[in-house]
Amino acid sequence: QHERGIERPQRVCGDQLAIFEVGSTLYLLLSDGMGTGEPAHREAAMTVRLLREFLEAGIEPVSALRTLNAALMLRGEEGGGFTTIDLLALQRPTGAGTLYKYGAAPSYLKRGGCVTRVTGQSLPAGLQQGADGPESTRLSLQAGSFFVMVSDGVADETDDEWLQNLMAGWSG
């Protein structure tokens, strides 16, 4: 909302987060509905709810994400929206994980003093054509390492040096 060139803060956030376990897999899910306010909130909330239901029903992450992308594409034809998705599937016993991305902002893995930026080039879910996507990256989280997912507005690929420096200096 704009009034005389001044943006008024939104009361509702378009970002949604879920953390849940299915068997020995821990899922971290971040979705950012496109746009602002209530419409963005609804898109992200629906995305998180459906994806969580698919995964809890035993559907593999790639199949669940592709199904969701197809459903969002159909909704888009009827005036629905689209959303970014970051999904980390982490195997609790080993720390091995896979990060899936649909149009999401960079994510960051810190291991020792090294921070690695993990990016993707795919479009948001609902805009990605065909069977392309999601992009996936294999990760290994070991004792003392940590992983950070952010939505747009926190950092992007051209302006995230401050975040990488902050993470590199953090020992927590």
Regions found by a protein language model. Name each.
Residues H41-G112:
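Catalytic core of PPM/PP2C metal-dependent serine/threonine phosphatase domains
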Residues Q1-M34, P39, M46-R49, P134-T137:
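N-terminal entry segment of metal-dependent catalytic domains or homologous docking segments
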Residues G35-A57, S122, L141, S145-G172:
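Active-site-proximal, acidic helix/loop segment immediately C-terminal to a metal-coordinating Asp/Glu
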Residues L29, K101, F147-M149:
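Residue-level marker for buried hydrophobic side chains located in beta-strands
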Residues M34-T36, A104-S107, C114-T116, A155-D156:
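Short, surface-exposed beta-strand-loop junctions and turns on beta-sheet-rich folds
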Residues Q10-G23, T83-I85, R117-D159:
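Acidic loop->beta-strand submotif enriched in PP2C/PPM serine/threonine phosphatases
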Residues R8, Y27, E38, R42, ...:
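Cytosolic nucleotide-utilizing catalytic cores of signal-transduction proteins
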